[in-house]
């Protein structure tokens, strides 16, 4: 199949592109190479994609989507392009309206125009707000804690509206704290490992619990959803809530660096924990990588870059 991925030089997008290419699909990605974090890391991922025979189209979804879509016959498009992260959304909420809501509407309109058979949208566990326990999909009720979460929740509702109005086939993934090699530098585990390897102190904000989900589990689930032509909303997580303080303490002890604690940041929820029964029953999703194993793979990747 011909598969398109927006945000394909991002962490999840590039990993998904490599997986689908390895499975025999013809993959093309579009990315604007924005500077939310180090652009060189995105360019590095893009070079790896190109070395593997994956087309990389540099362009902005708002302006260049027709050119990209018009030159392909995609059987499915994964829409991952967005501004990520809670802290940035507190500083520049209007950018998240533009790049997380309006951009999704642009993709939905294009999916109608170009008759894309199947669309998958990348959402976030942040849409659940401040809740405890293993969360089911119906428990997202709009009681969000940040502009980022509000943008993702709004984009989800646009997807559902277009599915109801126009019959678009849409699958929505709610990702839970995705981590792994070549990840996002603003994420806690990436930051902790970089600092620990450099002998720098680690800082934990609050006492958060996170359902850390390894990148390979995430992309495997996305491929399974593609194979099943799944529609609806699906949690993709590890089903294993872990203490961020414990993860930092383990790294601190291993690399002999101090761990400091600071107040929780505005907009962050205290816990994420996924119930993935819907994904398991619909397309066979079963996460398998433990946090300990995933962190070892990250440490190896970071060491190789020092």
Feature map (PLM): residue ranges:
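A conserved pocket-lining segment of Rossmann-fold NAD(P)-dependent short-chain dehydrogenase/reductase
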Residues: 89, 139-141, 170-181, 191-213, ...
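Conserved hydrophobic/aromatic "anchor" residues
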Residues: 11, 128, 176-179, 212-214, ...
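N-terminal Rossmann-like NAD(P)+-binding domain of SDR-like oxidoreductases, especially those catalyzing
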Residues: 1-174, 178
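Short-chain dehydrogenase/reductase
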Residues: 97, 145-156, 183-190, 211-212, ...
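A glycine/serine/threonine-rich, flexible loop-to-helix segment
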Residues: 134, 185-193, 251
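Hydrophobic alpha-helix immediately C-terminal to the catalytic Tyr-X-X-X-Lys motif of short-chain
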Residues: 154, 158, 162, 192, ...
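C-terminal substrate-binding subdomain of Rossmann-fold SDR/epimerase-dehydratase oxidoreductases
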Residues: 196-306
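Conserved active-site region of classical short-chain dehydrogenase/reductase
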Residues: 101-109, 186, 216-219, 223
């Amino acid at each position: 199949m011909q598969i398109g991925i927006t945000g394909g030089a991002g962490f999840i997008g590039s990993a998904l592109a490599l997986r689908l290419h390895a499975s025999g699909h013809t993959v093309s990605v579009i990315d604007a190479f924005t500077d939310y974090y180090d652009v060189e890391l995105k360019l590095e991922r893009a070079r790896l994609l190109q070395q593997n025979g994956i087309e990389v189209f540099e362009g902005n979804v708002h302006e260049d989507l027709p050119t990209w879509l018009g030159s392909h016959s995609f059987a499915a498009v994964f829409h991952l392009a967005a501004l990520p992260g809670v802290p940035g959304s507190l500083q520049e909420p209007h950018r998240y309206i533009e790049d997380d809501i309006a951009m999704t509407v642009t993709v939905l309109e294009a999916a109608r125009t170009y008759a894309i058979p199947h669309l998958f949208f990348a959402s976030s566990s942040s849409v659940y707000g401040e809740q405890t326990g293993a969360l089911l999909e119906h428990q997202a009720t709009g009681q969000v804690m940040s502009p980022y979460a509000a943008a993702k929740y709004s984009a989800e509702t646009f997807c559902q509206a277009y599915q109801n109005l126009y019959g678009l086939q849409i699958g929505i993934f709610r990702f839970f704290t995705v981590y792994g090699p070549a990840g996002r530098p603003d994420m806690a585990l990436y930051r902790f490992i970089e600092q620990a390897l450099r002998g720098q102190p680690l800082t934990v904000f609050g006492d958060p619990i996170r359902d850390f989900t390894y990148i390979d589990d995430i992309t495997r689930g996305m491929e399974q959803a593609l194979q099943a032509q799944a529609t609806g909303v699906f949690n993709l997580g590890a089903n294993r809530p872990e203490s961020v303080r414990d993860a930092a303490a383990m790294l601190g002890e291993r690399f002999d660096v101090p761990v400091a604690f600071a107040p929780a940041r505005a907009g962050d929820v205290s816990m994420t924990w996924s119930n993935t029964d819907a994904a398991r029953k619909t397309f066979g999703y079963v996460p398998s990588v433990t946090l300990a194993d995933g962190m070892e793979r990250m440490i190896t990747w970071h060491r190789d870059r020092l």
